[in-house]
Design a protein with these regions (language model features):
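Metabolite-binding pocket within alpha/beta catalytic cores that recognizes anionic/polar moieties
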Residues: 1-127
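Active-site rim beta-loop-alpha module in soluble metabolic enzymes
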Residues: 129-174
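His/Asp/Glu-rich mid-to-C-terminal helical/loop segments that flank catalytic regions of hydrolases
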Residues: 208-258
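Zn-dependent metallopeptidase/amidohydrolase metal-coordination segment
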Residues: 181-219
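Non-catalytic positions within long, well-ordered alpha-helices that form the structural scaffold/packing
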Residues: 74-77, 173, 191
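Generic secondary-structure signature for well-ordered alpha-helical cores
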Residues: 78, 104-106, 139-148, 161, ...
Length: 260
């Protein structure tokens, strides 16, 4: 079974680049995942692809079954989770169209299922929540491909589904670089399960801190569609470079706090 999972939107599943082998829709202790998991190959590498927001039942960010999603991928044997997502920019130098390989997150969500340990005290350690090994793999690929990217970025995760007010956006600029709605709790659930996690984020807009700019879903979709090829190229180059035992830090962190 695949050791690598890719979580993203419809565009990532491209019949021209994704060789479909089978579809599975497993049950988990937390219900069904957000969609069927597509098992196939990208650049000759076997992967499990999951549409985070679903295709038959549309899940807004607050309602995504994050626990079921990560659990299902773990049960399929995945060790590595690569998230492809859209983000807004909170800093001038993070320009729409840029790729960001995030290295930290700040959590401003409010009503999600954050842990698998509701009946047990487990304090997961995530000082560095994104896998340094995976980040380094995709940094090398981005560099090789000549893509405009940022190695490192503080991802601020808001509840959604609404976008920020201008006051919020100005406040967020004081401590974050990019803003989105999906990394939390996906990232920390992966850590609880001992899976490595990285986020390949495409900047689609400047949020609303620029007085003449505003963000809407059409703008996000338009920019994401225009830049999708960069994400696909990054996956095609980076996935074959991921080694089976490339990282032990993430699983050791989960074991160290009693999560595994």
């Amino acid at each position: 079974m695949p050791k690598i999972a890719v979580v993203g939107g419809t565009g990532i599943y491209n019949p021209d680049t994704f060789e479909l082998i089978e579809e599975v829709y497993p049950d988990t202790p937390y219900g069904k995942p957000s969609d069927k998991i597509l098992i196939g190959k990208i650049a000759g590498v076997e992967v499990s692809f999951l549409h985070r927001h679903g295709t038959t039942i549309p899940y807004p960010p607050s309602s995504v079954p994050y626990r079921a999603n990560m659990w299902a991928l773990k049960e399929l044997g995945c060790k590595y989770v690569i998230s492809a997502c859209a983000v807004g920019s909170l800093q001038e130098e993070f320009v729409p169209g840029d790729l960001v390989i995030a290295d930290q997150f700040i959590d401003f969500t409010k009503r999600r299922d954050y842990t698998y340990f509701d009946d047990k005290i487990v304090h997961i350690s995530i000082p560095d929540p994104f896998c340094p090994y995976l980040n380094s793999v995709f940094e090398e690929s981005a560099k090789k491909l000549g893509l405009k990217y940022h190695m490192g970025g503080r991802y601020l995760c808001i509840e959604g589904p609404r976008f920020s007010t201008r006051a919020e956006s100005h406040m967020f600029r004081n401590f974050a670089d990019i803003i989105g709605m999906t990394v939390v709790p996906e990232c920390q659930l992966a850590r609880e399960l001992g899976m490595c996690y990285c986020s390949l984020a495409t900047v689609t807009d400047y949020d609303v801190w620029k007085e003449d700019d505003a963000v809407d879903i059409d703008m996000v979709k338009e920019t994401m569609a225009r830049c999708l090829n960069n994400v696909l190229r990054l996956l095609e180059d980076g996935l074959p470079a991921i080694e089976d035992e490339g990282c032990v830090e993430c699983i050791e962190a989960a074991k160290g706090c009693g999560a595994l």
